[in-house]
Amino acid sequence: MAQQRALPQSKETLLQSYNKRLKDDIKSIMDNFTEIIKTAKIEDETQVSRATQGEQDNYEMHVRAANIVRAGESLMKLVSDLKQFLILNDFPSVNEAIDQRNQQLRALQEECDRKLITLRDEVSIDLYELEEEYYSSSSSLCEANDLPLCEAYWRLDLDTDSADGLSAPLLASPETGAGPLQSAAPVHSHGGGPGPTEHT
């Protein structure tokens, strides 16, 4: 079995080794199972006692059952080796799987590109509308400041005249009230001097 487990280098020899292992394991399972069935048959005439024959048959059945289990494990190992062989040496299948995966990724990339282009167009349209709204509102606010020079000068004169007209009454109001304020001033008498003389 150890010589059968050694994996040759060439693919052809390796496949032949796999085939031989498969046949040997299947033959081992069939032979041991057949012998177990034969052992289960009860014989009438035996050279040894029935108890001794029973113990011998029991031991033989255990050994052959262990051989069947070992052959089954060998088949499972063979399946694992075949999978590894196909993965490492089946280049057409590997290339086909790689090409299929590349096609899936390219389709996904194209779909992402289309979505990004659509999103870019929508953002551009919204940005353009926002710019138009911003500049239109800014221009309406700046129309009052963007007047011609003569009109701006005329408005400046009007503002100056209105300011002068408002300040003139404020300046004149103290003069009109000066007379009564002066006439109402109290007369201070000198305590040590003579009082006012009366002229006749």
From Swiss-Prot:
Region (Disordered): 167-200
Coiled coil, from the record: 93-122
Subcellular location: Nucleus
Gene Ontology MF, one: transcription coregulator activity
Chief site of localization: nucleus
Annotated GO biological process: regulation of transcription by RNA polymerase II
Top-level taxon: Eukaryota
GO CC terms in record: core mediator complex; mediator complex; nucleus
Family label: Belongs to the Mediator complex subunit 22 family.
Protein name as catalogued: Mediator of RNA polymerase II transcription subunit 22
